[in-house]
C-alpha cells in the first residue's frame, strides 16, 4: 500500500494546505492521487477541507466518511449531532479500499495526532499502525513548536509509526529570531520536507500550482508511490 497520513502538532498549523500542496505536486508529476479526510467537523459553518484541497490541488478524487456540522473535536461534534463516530475497522477498510498500485493515498487527520477519530478512542496514529503508513507532521514556526513537535514524534515512536518528515505549514513573510531558530532546531528533529509561505491558501489556483510544483523534493515525492 502507498498511504501517507498527514497530521499536525495542533489544529490550525496548515495541514490542509500542506496536503493540497503535496497532492498538487504529485498530480502535476503524473502520479495518481486520492485524498481522504475520514472525519470532518464544522461542515455546518462551511468548513470543508476536502473541497479546499480539491480547489487548490486540482485532484478530483476526494473521499470522506463521516461529517459533522459543529466545529468541535470529532467526539464532541458527533455527540452534538446525535451520530456515532465510525469504528476503527470501518476507517481502515475505507482507506484500504481507496489504495492501489501506483497510487498515492493521502489521509488527513483532524487536529493533532491523538485526537479521537473513531469510536472506542481510535486515532490517526492507530490508523497508521493498522495501515502500515508513515506520518507527515505539519508544524508551526513560533514559540512552543519545539515541544509540540517533540511530543508528536515521541508519540509516533512509541507505536513504531515512521515519521515521513516535517513541513512548516505557515512560514511568515518576515521571520524573526524565534522563527529562524526554531526552523533550524526542527530540522534537527526530523527531515524538513517543505516550508510553505503563510497565506498560501489565498493564492490563485494557478499560482498555487506553481508554488506546489517545487514545494517538496521531487525525488522524495517519487519514493512515496509503491
Swiss-Prot record:
Single Gene Ontology MF annotation: magnesium ion binding
Nucleotide-binding among keywords: yes
Protein purpose: Catalyzes a mechanistically unusual reaction, the ATP-dependent insertion of CO2 between the N7 and N8 nitrogen atoms of 7,8-diaminopelargonic acid (DAPA, also called 7,8-diammoniononanoate) to form a ureido ring.
Protein name: ATP-dependent dethiobiotin synthetase BioD
Catalytic activities: (7R,8S)-7,8-diammoniononanoate + CO2 + ATP = (4R,5S)-dethiobiotin + ADP + phosphate + 3 H(+)
Keyword Isomerase: no
Location(s) in or outside the cell: Cytoplasm
Pfam families: AAA_26 (PF13500)
Organism phylogeny: Bacteria, Bacillati, Actinomycetota, Actinomycetes, Mycobacteriales
EC number: 6.3.3.3
UniProt gene name: bioD
Main subcellular location: cytoplasm
Coiled-coil regions listed: none
Binding site for ATP: 12-17, 49, 108-111, 169-170
Broad enzyme group: ligase
One Gene Ontology term from the biological process aspect of the record: biotin biosynthetic process
Record family assignment: Belongs to the dethiobiotin synthetase family.
Record organism: Mycobacterium marinum (strain ATCC BAA-535 / M)
One GO location term (cellular component): cytosol
Keywords, in A-Z order: ATP-binding, Biotin biosynthesis, Cytoplasm, Ligase, Magnesium, Metal-binding, Nucleotide-binding
Names of the cofactor(s): Mg(2+)
Pathway(s) this gene product operates in, as recorded in its UniProt entry: Cofactor biosynthesis; biotin biosynthesis; biotin from 7,8-diaminononanoate: step 1/2
Catalytic site positions: 37
Amino acid at each position: 500500500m502507498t498511504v501517507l497520513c498527514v497530521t499536525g502538532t495542533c489544529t490550525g498549523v496548515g495541514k490542509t494546505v500542506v496536503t493540497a500542496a503535496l497532492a498538487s505536486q504529485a498530480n502535476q508529476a503524473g502520479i495518481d492521487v486520492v485524498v481522504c479526510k475520514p472525519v470532518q467537523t464544522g461542515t455546518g459553518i462551511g468548513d470543508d477541507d476536502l473541497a479546499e484541497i480539491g480547489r487548490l490541488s486540482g485532484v478530483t478524487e476526494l473521499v470522506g466518511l463521516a461529517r459533522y456540522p459543529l466545529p468541535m473535536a470529532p467526539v464532541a461534534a458527533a455527540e452534538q449531532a446525535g451520530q456515532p463516530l465510525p469504528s476503527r475497522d470501518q476507517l481502515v477498510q475505507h482507506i484500504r479500499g481507496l489504495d492501489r498500485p501506483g497510487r498515492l493515498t493521502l489521509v488527513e487527520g483532524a487536529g493533532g495526532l491523538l485526537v479521537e477519530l473513531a469510536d472506542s478512542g481510535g486515532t490517526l496514529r492507530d490508523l497508521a499502525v493498522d495501515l502500515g503508513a508513515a506520518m507527515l507532521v505539519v508544524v508551526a514556526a513560533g514559540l512552543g513548536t519545539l515541544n509540540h513537535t517533540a511530543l508528536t514524534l515521541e508519540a509516533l515512536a512509541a507505536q513504531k509509526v515512521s515519521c515521513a518528515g516535517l513541513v512548516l505549514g505557515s512560514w511568515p513573510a518576515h521571520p524573526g529570531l524565534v522563527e529562524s531558530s526554531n526552523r533550524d532546531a526542527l530540522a534537527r528533529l526530523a527531515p524538513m520536507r517543505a516550508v510553505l509561505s503563510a497565506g498560501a491558501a489565498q493564492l490563485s489556483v494557478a499560482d498555487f500550482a506553481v508554488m506546489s510544483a517545487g514545494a517538496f523534493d521531487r525525488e522524495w515525492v517519487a519514493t512515496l508511490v509503491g
